[in-house]
Every structure is written in structure tokens, then in C-alpha cells.
Amino acid sequence: MKKTLLLFYLFTCLNNAIAQSDPVLKDKPGSTGHSQKVSGAFNSTRVINAHSTEMLEKGNLDFRVLHRFGFISDGIKQFFGLDAASFRMSFDYGITDNLTVGIGRSTFRKEVDAFVKARLFQQTVSTKPFSLLLAGGYVIHTDESFAPKKPSLADRSAYYLQLIAGRKFNSRFSMQLSPILVHTNIPFPITDDRKIFALGGGAKYKLSKRTALTLDYHHPFGTLAENYTDPLSIGVDIATGGHVFQLHFSNATGMNERAYITQTTGRFFKGNMRFGFNLSRIFRISNRRK
């Protein structure tokens, strides 16, 4: 955990060099200033694994493909992880500028998940120093091999509730905190706590008009199996028009909140990391204004 906190510190240090002179959060001539909203804290609605403070615009559909290979530390026998992969596909839709819903399916435990994400308020130049969002989700696994007998719907279900508070400090640097509560009706193994609280964080440092460094991390509190550890992901965003391409390294196999919060096994700083990518493509489904 100390090494991860050091990474966040380094991201913050990158911000200090330009924080005093960057004009992005200053009033523009002729603007009201107080009500001017600040946008673009992150390139996508996800930092890497975690929800970000970004929202879909009304009428936009986000088609997402997430791919995570095996551990690089497995070596040449598994072609450094390329022979093993985990996959998630999802569709997110902006009902309004402040309300997004989504559904996805993962190969890890054959899980199906759905979520609702609402923006409570958005950062402005003068009156609101940060954005605040609330996300809640449902996850169900369909892999019956995890139980000695056919489990019921309730036995296969999990839920999460997350608060996301983030700030765009200047045109290059953004950071967020995202505490989350995950409840799994039947955890695996059964000795794990059903309710796990985790404190998460995410950061972005913009390198150029189209590229940025990103990082997200969660520290779970409670009883989990000894082989489970904190999920950490470090990546590079490449934005190209309607696409966002995220290349990253992560120790997490699962790509929904239940999976990566409660069942991450790789120890990142011991070489147990996976290479992966996220692809986001935005489609305009309906007109913003009628």
C-alpha cells in the first residue's frame, strides 16, 4: 500500500509545476465565472477499472470492450500472459447529462452486471470546488462450478454503492476519491466478509492533447482470503475523436466492482501484473435537443 501511495504522491508532484499559472479554472472574460462548469477531468467514464467523475451526455451510447491478459510473470510458457485472457463487453447510455445506466457481461465467473450512476453536482470555476457522483450496481454470476449445488438467484448476487468525489485541478491534472461498499450474498471463499468497504482513488495527468497517464487503486477493509490483495492499475489513455483507447497494466482479473474489489489475486509490485486494454466508442443515439 505504501508503494501505491507513493505513486499518488508522484502524480500530485507533477501537478505542482503548473498549478500556479494554469488558466483553465480562472474566469474567462465576459463569463459569469461562478456558474461556469468544469469538464474533462478524465477522458472516459472509467479511470481504468473504476467509475470516474465523467458522465455520458444525454442520448449518447458508450460501447466498451475490456480485455485483460494473464500474468506477465507466467513467462514464456503462457507467452507472458497472452495465452490467458479475461473479457468484458458493456453498453452504457446517457439518459440525461446527469444520469447514466449500463449493463455488461464478463468472462470472469461469467458475471452479468448493471449499474446506475448519477451526478449530484458538477465542479464549477468559483462556487463548487469538486464534482460529486453516486453509483450503484448489481452483479450476478452464472458460473455454477463455484458451488457444490445449483445456487439460487440470491446466492449468486452481489451489490455495490459508491460515492465519487473528484476535482480537475488544472488543464493537466485531475484526482478523485471513491469510497465503495460491496455486499456479496455468498462470498468465495465463504469465510470472507459479506460486506467489504474499500477506499479508492484515481488520477490523470495529461501528457498531450490526446494522451494521458492514468492510475486507479482501491484498498479493501475487512476479512478477505490471504491470496486476495489491493487492485492497482496504471495506464495510458489515447483519445481519438469518438474513441478512447486505454492501455494499462493491472493486477486485477475481474472488471466489475465486485470482482476487482474482492477477488484480486496478483501482487503488482512482485511482477504479478496483467497487460490489458479498454476500448470506448461513443455513438449518438438521439438528438440532444428536440
Regions found by a protein language model. Give the residues of each.
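Transmembrane beta-barrel domains of Gram-negative outer membranes and organellar outer membranes
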Residues: 20-147, 157-161, 166-185, 205, ...
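A mid-sequence, solvent-exposed acidic-amphipathic segment
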Residues: 173-219
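Bacterial Sec-dependent N-terminal signal peptides
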Residues: 1-23
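Short hydrophobic "helix-edge" motifs at membrane interfaces and signal-peptide entry regions
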Residues: 4-5, 86, 199
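Positively charged, low-complexity, intrinsically disordered RNA-binding extensions
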Residues: 227
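C-terminal low-complexity, charged extensions that often adopt amphipathic alpha-helices
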Residues: 153-154
